[in-house]
């Protein structure tokens, strides 16, 4: 069915259409050009009225409205349509843009299900269902899991727009294929995920396995406390690392340094005392986090499971050290595994993971910030560059794209973009997503919960999708405060009534 015509100036990548009805943003159309049928995506749409264009007052508006209602030619429906490629090629996974722009007057048709099904729902084990096209809900949308692991993914959205639901869905689909997922859970959003084969781990840090700088961060010694840092560095010897009573040995070593320097360097007495206070805190306040007897934290991760590394009880610095440690160990393990498999090269240790791993960093702006160098950022950057060669995929999840390191974001081969209103965030996304236009980015402010623009290598084409809801996810949703208060009030009334009866009973007894 013809729904419009190409008008004005057209380009190989974009046309303007005059339609018989308003075209919805995200709607797919067919441009029936001389070279073949071309698929287009509506990016912007405008509705105009000749009668109501230049009204000056209310009475004139009323009269003009009456004229507009009886004049079939009054309304104009104009749309900007992005050209995606020839349909027959897209159905084979090839995006071929026409060399010659569609001529003005070219017919624009409504896209049918048979035109879209093969493009957005390809066959193959690597393609998994993730939702349905927003404007064509009868069309199933699939994404390529291989591309997620080999080329990484960024999931960017405001709080409450469905980021953790999408992470849960991807994790569930990977796990259905016996894959291994690791989620760094900074806000305890995933520990109650009711999915089979889930492994929840309270992330612990073994101080013996750290270097002096990392230990200083874990103990929360300030960066500008140079003397404290120096004392810790001197005390953190190989012998201390190997001593059974780790904290006691470290404290004794600090005391020895204080005594050796108390005459010549009096500042060592105060600073050394502060280090000892930090060691005492580690033994008592942070004993459930810092455990010298956990010899291999990586050993707690199970292959073929969804592993939730709960780092919600760690401070920001401690979490940074924990994330960097796990990322480093996982990358090294995957390197050893690939080398042992393909090069027949002997390694110092037996690899723990025999197949690819997908790692998700929640609240990624905390660990890979734009303005600061952190250890987690270093290893995340290394995985973003090298992970594809060793089967280690990275998922970066954040509600503050503007605060993320742009070099790492630029290496995310795929993006899921949900509702974002900050212009700085939108600018960061525009620079990271080459295959998405500024016009389409501007529309993300109008997306609803669960809606996402999918771009990059995990989809055949940029698409606006409503993401499938994960019913097993019970945490992370907004709380219904009004209902909770109503229930609390009801129980309060019951409690008061019960108390009054007890009082009356006691009075009767007396």
Predicted regions and their residues:
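Basic- and hydrophobic-enriched, low-structure N-terminal and domain-boundary segments
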Residues: 1-152, 170, 352-353, 404
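Conserved ATP-driven motor cores of ASCE-family P-loop NTPases powering translocation/secretion/packaging/pilus
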Residues: 71, 218-221, 384-388, 393-465
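Glycine-rich phosphate-binding loop of nucleotide-binding enzymes
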Residues: 125-205, 406, 454, 484-486, ...
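Conserved catalytic network of the ASCE P-loop NTPase/AAA+ motor domain
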Residues: 147-148, 173-177, 192, 300-301, ...
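Loop/turn-to-beta-strand initiation segments
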Residues: 177-182, 303-306, 354-358, 390-395
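Residues immediately C-terminal
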Residues: 189, 366-367, 402-403
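P-loop NTPase motor domains
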Residues: 192-198, 204-382, 448-456
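Conserved P-loop NTPase motor module
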Residues: 321, 450-510
């Amino acid at each position: 069915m013809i729904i419009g015509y190409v008008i004005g100036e057209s380009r190989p990548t974009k046309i303007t259409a005059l339609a018989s009805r308003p075209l919805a943003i995200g709607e797919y159309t067919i441009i029936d050009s001389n070279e073949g049928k071309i698929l287009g995506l509506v990016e912007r749409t405008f509705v105009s009225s000749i009668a109501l264009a230049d009204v000056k007052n209310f009475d004139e508006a009323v009269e003009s409205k009456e004229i507009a209602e009886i004049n079939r030619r009054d309304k104009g429906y104009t749309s900007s349509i992005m050209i995606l490629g020839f349909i027959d090629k897209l159905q084979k996974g090839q995006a071929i843009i026409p060399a010659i722009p569609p001529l003005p007057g070219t017919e624009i048709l409504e896209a049918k299900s048979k035109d879209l099904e093969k493009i957005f729902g390809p066959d193959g084990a690597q393609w998994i269902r993730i939702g349905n096209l927003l404007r064509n809900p009868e069309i199933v949308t699939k994404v390529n899991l291989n591309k997620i692991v080999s080329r990484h993914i960024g999931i960017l959205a405001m709080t409450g727009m469905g980021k953790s639901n999408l992470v849960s869905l991807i994790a569930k689909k990977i796990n259905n294929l016996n894959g291994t997922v690791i989620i760094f859970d900074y806000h305890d959003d995933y520990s109650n995920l009711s999915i089979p084969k889930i492994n929840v781990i309270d992330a612990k840090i073994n101080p013996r396995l750290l270097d002096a700088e990392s230990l200083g961060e874990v103990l929360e010694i300030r960066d500008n406390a140079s003397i404290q840092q120096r004392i810790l560095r001197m005390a953190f010897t190989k012998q201390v690392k190997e001593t059974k009573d780790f904290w006691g040995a470290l404290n004794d070593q600090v005391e020895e340094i204080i005594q050796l320097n108390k005459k010549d360097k009096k500042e060592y007495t105060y600073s050394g005392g502060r280090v000892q206070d930090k060691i005492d805190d580690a033994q008592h306040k942070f004993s459930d986090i810092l455990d010298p007897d956990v010899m291999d934290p990586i050993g707690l991760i199970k292959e073929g499971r969804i592993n939730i590394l709960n780092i919600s009880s760690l401070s920001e610095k401690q979490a940074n050290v924990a994330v960097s440690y796990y990322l480093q160990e996982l990358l090294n393990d995957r390197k050893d595994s690939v080398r042992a498999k393909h090069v027949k090269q002997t390694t110092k240790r037996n690899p723990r993971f025999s197949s690819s791993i997908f790692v998700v960093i929640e609240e990624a702006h905390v660990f890979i910030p734009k303005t600061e160098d952190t250890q987690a950022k270093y290893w995340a950057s290394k995985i973003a560059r090298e992970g594809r060669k060793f089967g280690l995929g990275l998922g970066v999840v954040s509600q503050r794209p503007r605060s993320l390191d742009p070099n790492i974001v630029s290496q995310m081969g795929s993006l899921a973009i949900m509702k974002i209103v900050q212009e700085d965030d939108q600018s960061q996304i525009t620079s990271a997503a080459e295959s998405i236009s500024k016009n389409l980015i501007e529309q993300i402010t109008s997306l609803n919960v669960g809606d996402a623009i999918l771009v990059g290598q995990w989809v055949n084409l940029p698409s606006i999708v409503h993401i499938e809801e994960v019913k097993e996810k019970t945490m992370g949703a907004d709380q219904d405060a009004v209902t909770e208060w109503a229930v609390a009030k009801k129980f309060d009334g019951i409690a008061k009534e019960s108390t009054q009866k007890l009082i009356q009973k006691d009075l009767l007894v007396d």
